[in-house]
């Protein structure tokens, strides 16, 4: 007896339809019936079927590969639903692999045609809010510092209150019991504006994972996601063809970030700042450099973290009176490798914003203050892009990352006309808003503009959610305001403290090798400078200090004379200052090659072995003054005369 016909339901991104079929029919026989319900330009060979929405992990099979298989043999029954995936012929011609329309058929919500293009190029690219890691506490590898801070209880110990405590010396009461690291009264008393990252983590964890509930552990951190989900399970066409409440981002309510991933920036020596300022002193143009250092525990705040800067590398750039234009940094990976061999990593960026006051006393104009701005909208966007490139790995986040430890420092004039350092970070919300192309810099530095979907100048496909922030209105009441078209940049900014160590002991004790990429002011790195640095005149202590220069190490790396093991040894000599390592270094083939290069270039190489195992290095000289003069004391040097001639030249 023939089987009774059944009705199968099909759902694709263009809608749903039904087909009446026989259980004995083969799958390929459905192709023509299915094509009747699909767009005319559908490629027949691209049709695939799945038991779940396409792209959500179902069992997807191409219809052509099911030849010889009957519908009844796979268990399909009356009323079952199958999900369709397919591609248009034009999409295949354009090289699309996901079937999304990439030509003018892609439209905004207002109907304006746009191509399907990536809006912002930032690495690494998060995929979606659902791209979580299973058991991140077992998989994600944190930094050793984060692991060490995780093991600390972070409690703030208090002494016995002689007035309020009635118990003995071994007792404890509410007046002397340890406080949590996020205690608001303690933070207000110590004038700590932002929680440290691990204090904030303890605060969230106390509310998310309560031990008394004995529930399964949930990571307390979750990165914001302000973009349209590309893996929406609703079955509608992908954005910008379609959108629903499941895939569109919610409205954004901006508020000052209560925590910071780095609490303090410490410069190991004032000479680091002075060397960067020297470029401005000689040219009058601004300068930018990347900070290399380490992250360490900062004991001034509970569970705090500080970035200790040991070196500043100045990448290729065009410097102007009012800003800097960065060129492509071809040897960035090589510089990062040299830093890694010295135990360092890229921790931030620093740039100058200085203008001589013209008083003749070295004072500069104060442009950044409470009535103007501290970090402009363009600079916040720049900081957010850099922070997006260097995410912070953490096992307390469902995606395995949260925020960034990358810092941004500015050298500018203070209210007294002196040159001072300021340290900042862009908030986590700011990084995601820049990544989602929701905001853009304004000509007014104190405000950030919200993008508009109707703006077709960039010809990009983006969804702009509603953005709100709270402010004190003219009646003294905190009221919610619509952030369009612009809002204050303070909502995207986190301030950090900065300073210098009480007893300076920099990792690199020499700093007179010419700094890279300064040819515009007549300074260049040449072999004669290497020969001059390495002449010890029999002084082993001086010879050890000679290679303890980050800029010299980067230049030697560019010569490719040392093997990887020899470069690692060179890094140890530069940072540890061990005479035994120095003796081993001058016995390597790479060192002999360097001597040969200096001889063939006509420069004078070291005349004798400059290290002895019996000798020990002298004490490292103390750090210089922490006062940054606006101009050098002696204007009679050759560099000063060159600077005077250069100052009138164009920097473009």
Swiss-Prot record:
Record's compositionally biased regions (Polar residues): 94-108, 116-130
Q: Which SUPFAM superfamilies match?
A: Ubiquitin-like
Region: Disordered, residue numbers:
94-132, 602-652
Alphabetically ordered keywords of this record: Cytoplasm, Endoplasmic reticulum, Membrane, mRNA transport, Nucleus, Protein transport, Translocation, Transport
Membrane topology term reads:
Peripheral membrane protein
Role according to the record: Involved in the import of nuclear-targeted proteins into the nucleus and the export of poly(A) RNA out of the nucleus. Has a role in the endoplasmic reticulum-associated degradation (ERAD) pathway.
> Can you say what this protein is called?
Nuclear protein localization protein 4
